[in-house]
C-alpha cells in the first residue's frame, strides 16, 4: 500500500538507473517528497551513492578480452617544494589489454589543492595517456605530505588503483 496511517512507519526503496548516469564514483542527489500528491518544498531526501561497474556477470572469455590498466609508476616523490609554488606531475596509464580502457573517475580527495586531468577518457589497446596532477601549495602548511589518489577504470581485474604523491612543503 502507498498510504501510511498516523503513527505508522514505512520503507522507501530507491532504485537508481545506472544506464542513465553521466558520472561515475561518489555522488549526492536529492529526492523530492510528495504528501497527498503535493510536493513538500522543505522535505527532500538526500541520497549518497558510489557508482561503480559490476563485473560479476562477465564470462572468462570476456575477462580475457578486457582492458588492463597499467600504471607505469604508481608512486611519485616530488621532493621539497617551496610554499606558494604550483607543480605539475604526471602518472602514465597504459592499456595493456585487448579492448579500450576507460577512465571512470579520478579522486584526489583534496580538490582544494590537488587536481587531476587527462587528455582522453578512452585509451585504445597498447596506448597510454598521461594523468596530470596539479599541486597548488599556496595554502599548505610546511610539512611532509603523502597524498593518495584514487583511479577507477573499466579494468575488471583491478578496477580501482591508488596512486601516491609524496612531497614536502618548505619556506
How would you describe each model-predicted region?
Residues 15, 32-34, 48, 92-94, ...:
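Residue-level recognition of well-ordered beta-strand positions that form the cores
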Residues 1-11, 98-127:
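Surface-exposed binding patches on compact interaction domains or structured appendages
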Residues 19-32, 42-44, 83-90, 138-150:
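Short, solvent-exposed loop/turn segments enriched in Ser/Thr/Gly
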Residues 5-9, 22-26, 40, 82, ...:
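Surface-exposed coil/turn segments at beta-strand junctions on protein surfaces, enriched
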Residues 2-4, 18-19, 78-79, 118-123, ...:
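Beta-strand-rich interaction surfaces with strong enrichment in secreted/lumenal proteins
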Residues 36-92, 96-98, 156-171:
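Long, low-complexity ectodomains and other extracytoplasmic segments of secretory-pathway proteins
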Residues 12-20, 131-139:
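Short, hydrophobic beta-strand segments
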Amino acid at each position: 500500500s502507498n498510504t501510511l496511517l498516523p503513527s505508522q512507519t514505512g520503507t522507501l526503496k530507491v532504485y537508481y538507473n545506472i544506464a542513465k548516469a553521466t558520472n561515475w564514483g561518489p555522488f549526492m542527489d536529492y529526492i523530492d517528497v510528495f504528501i497527498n500528491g503535493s510536493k513538500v518544498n522543505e522535505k527532500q531526501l538526500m541520497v549518497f551513492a558510489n557508482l561503480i561497474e559490476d563485473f560479476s556477470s562477465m564470462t572468462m572469455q570476456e575477462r580475457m578480452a578486457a582492458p588492463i590498466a597499467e600504471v607505469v609508476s604508481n608512486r611519485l616523490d616530488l621532493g621539497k617544494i617551496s610554499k606558494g609554488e604550483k607543480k605539475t606531475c604526471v602518472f602514465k596509464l597504459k592499456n595493456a589489454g585487448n579492448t579500450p580502457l576507460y577512465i571512470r573517475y579520478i579522486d584526489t580527495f583534496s580538490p582544494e589543492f590537488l587536481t587531476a586531468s587527462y587528455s582522453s577518457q578512452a585509451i585504445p589497446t597498447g596506448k597510454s595517456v598521461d594523468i596530470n596532477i596539479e599541486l597548488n601549495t599556496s595554502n599548505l602548511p610546511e610539512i611532509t605530505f603523502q597524498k593518495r589518489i584514487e583511479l577507477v577504470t573499466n579494468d575488471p581485474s583491478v578496477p580501482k588503483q591508488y596512486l601516491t604523491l609524496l612531497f614536502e612543503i618548505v619556506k
